[in-house]
A protein has these predicted regions:
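FIC/Doc superfamily catalytic core
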Residues: 1-161
Length: 161
């Protein structure tokens, strides 16, 4: 990964920080924006596929189906800090099912994003019917992120692929 030095500039705190502590430099990843954009775009594509596959795609375009883009942005901002595919999938289920970034299809999109994250980590879910009921319960607020992670650990197995 290429690392570049970037001077922190702008903003009230940064001006105060420079006055008190001198010039401050921060190491940033050169490909950070592309990673974030890839996450955001992937979620939009998954959502679009979910809506098309269930016959619910309306005349709206891909961007028009987003109700709360800040929820997707928040998810993509914190995703990289989670250590493994199970905790990332738990975050996806909790975040997308509860923050409702889309007009329709939030639970289905949460499920598909979680499946994609698990597959990326070499894991598969055991039973889709049980998973569907679990996702509904999550959306009703019956489980928090830690409960979701425990459930995923008990209901996944190594992929044969």
């Amino acid at each position: 990964m290429k690392v570049v030095r970037k001077s922190m500039s702008g903003g009230f705190f940064n001006r105060i920080g420079r006055k008190l502590f001198g010039r401050r430099d921060v190491l940033t990843s050169a490909n950070m924006k592309s990673s974030y954009q890839k996450c955001y775009d992937s979620i939009l594509i998954i959502h679009h596929r979910v809506m098309v596959s269930t016959g619910e795609e309306r005349e709206r375009g891909l961007e028009d189906s987003v109700l709360n883009s800040a929820a997707i942005q928040g998810f993509c901002d914190v995703l990289e800090y989670y250590p493994n595919s199970i905790s990332k999938a738990a975050l996806a289920i909790d975040y997308i099912a509860n923050f409702h970034p889309f007009v329709e299809g939030n639970k289905r999109t949460a499920f598909e994003v979680a499946v994609a994250l698990l597959r990326k980590g070499g894991l598969e879910l055991n039973d889709d019917d049980e998973t569907f009921n679990f996702i509904k319960d999550v959306a009703w607020g019956k489980y928090d992120r830690e409960d979701i992670e425990v459930w995923l650990r008990c209901n996944t197995h190594l992929s044969n692929l």
